[in-house]
Amino acid sequence: MEFSVKSGSPEKQRSACIVVGVFEPRRLSPIAEQLDKISDGYISALLRRGELEGKPGQTLLLHHVPNVLSERILLIGCGKERELDERQYKQVIQKTINTLNDTGSMEAVCFLTELHVKGRNNYWKVRQAVETAKETLYSFDQLKTNKSEPRRPLRKMVFNVPTRRELTSGERAIQHGLAIAAGIKAAKDLGNMPPNICNAAYLASQARQLADSYSKNVITRVIGEQQMKELGMHSYLAVGQGSQNESLMSVIEYKGNASEDARPIVLVGKGLTFDSGGISIKPSEGMDEMKYDMCGAAAVYGVMRMVAELQLPINVIGVLAGCENMPGGRAYRPGDVLTTMSGQTVEVLNTDAEGRLVLCDVLTYVERFEPEAVIDVATLTGACVIALGHHITGLMANHNPLAHELIAASEQSGDRAWRLPLGDEYQEQLESNFADMANIGGRPGGAITAGCFLSRFTRKYNWAHLDIAGTAWRSGKAKGATGRPVALLAQFLLNRAGFNGEE
């Protein structure tokens, strides 16, 4: 679908459809009032007759309104004006896209971007409208033989801004929104792929294709098991021992700043393409969803795609830590003691706490890049789901300014995170009688002790950890990957690149 931005009054728009808002109780938005005035009260008369209350999600499609050049006007209920927040704004946009498609509109001029959303400017409203529209239209049917094509006639959406001064920021918002939406789609597509297709080799092939598409300043290196062995990544290797699929670590390097002192930001994604739990095997119910255990790597891939598409003037490295945790005659066992790349030893008490065993070696590996900051993204703990549910990502960090940056980016993007502590008292739960540490610390504070485990391998740089176990995918009827936290990390990198969304 094509997006553009313009500035103009509604009475001068000649389009298939104009979209305007109506508030509760039957209150016209300023743009709707203009249309009502030129139509001699036609719209307000309909509202007085009870055709539309203005409640969230209500719609009313008007045809051939007197004195209006456009063929149709779509009235969208926006709820109470003072209560219109970010979440409700996105829901209104989603309802708009679905209604326009259902009613056969091929193009529309949308004035909803002129609604007042507290604390949000036109750049934010246009960008969120683009991202929400693309999210609404997303489907994953690549593997279906009988594809039922949904009715999607909508081809063009024009967002209106109040004055010509906002056109530049509106165009930038569309550019950024499309790049972020493409990154989210890429992450969702990877996450939704079945594990018999999407293994570590598949992740590596996608990373190579990304480098081919942006060969100007993106290179990809794939590190196999033999090289990992030479590097001393025994913890990472142990996790994949039970699988017939080779563990592969894909390193994507984007160079947007040629300055010698421009240190990179490193993103590390957990890429367990299937997690059976290993010898500590998971229950069969819901095990199919363990294909989503690579959503951290999928998100990093999506972010790298966004960065390359926008050619941000920063250096970013993305690492996809591909692996598969399976039971078998060669699988690692509870009771094993592993020597990590850092030299520290780990006693394995549970083979289903494997993500941290992969990540700890990758976090040591990335020291060679002398990073500005390292952020790992992982579907790491069920404990984080218990703590924060399915709406907010868990954040831990060893550097307060980095944590504050990520929280700010989460608020800007609407892809929210909440910081959890990393106190020394939690480290005591990882004590082992036979190694430097155990790979689990018991049930209390499980998300935090997992973060504490990782923190032992991040002492040489500023680091943050995003636990997306509760936010990376949805279960039930709407089962599927969400693409989070691509939007959060994209905003973080946009801020680092100087695009903070201010007009």
UniProtKB/Swiss-Prot annotation:
UniProt GO cellular component terms: cytoplasm
Sequence similarity: Belongs to the peptidase M17 family.
GO molecular function, one term: transcription antitermination factor activity, DNA binding
InterPro entries listed in its UniProt record: Leucine_aapep/pepB, Macro_dom-like, Peptidase_M17_C, Peptidase_M17_leu_NH2_pept, Peptidase_M17_N
Name of the protein this chain belongs to: Cytosol aminopeptidase
Functional description taken from the UniProt entry: Probably involved in the processing and regular turnover of intracellular proteins. Catalyzes the removal of unsubstituted N-terminal amino acids from various peptides. Required for plasmid ColE1 site-specific recombination but not in its aminopeptidase activity. Could act as a structural component of the putative nucleoprotein complex in which the Xer recombination reaction takes place.
EC number in record: 3.4.11.1, 3.4.11.10
Activity regulation, per record: Inhibited by zinc and EDTA.
PANTHER family, A to Z: CYTOSOL AMINOPEPTIDASE, LEUCINE AMINOPEPTIDASE-RELATED
Domain of life assignment: Bacteria
Active site: 282, 356
